[in-house]
């Protein structure tokens, strides 16, 4: 049973990674980018409240789907939004945050689980739902991908997104 709890998350990640980019090309990168973290946060909360192995496994699968779909979409957005000279550095920085997340998760497990009684694992998982707040506060303000908008014939919105990044970067409009 323990191996399933870990393995099912990787199954979800594989599926999410396989379909995340496809869905983002259809409905928008920003939509999927925001949805993946919301899915992750809600599923983490569901895992913390699970009352059966089946519910725990289902929530873990959904967490994997969210994380897996995040991978291609986040990398694509960072690549599209980064200046050419900084694109490689920005992508590496993005990917390094996975390691930061693992370290934070390990620290939460180390400090929270043994110090909060029988419900320690639930508290640790509930803390994992906090990225949901991050998604609500920050990701909803990220503009849609310029390439996606252009591909959908939404040139005015694409131009607005370009202006947003020019202003943020201190670049004068062309």
Over which residues does each language-model region extend?
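Transmembrane-helix signature of 12-pass secondary carriers
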Residues: 1-174
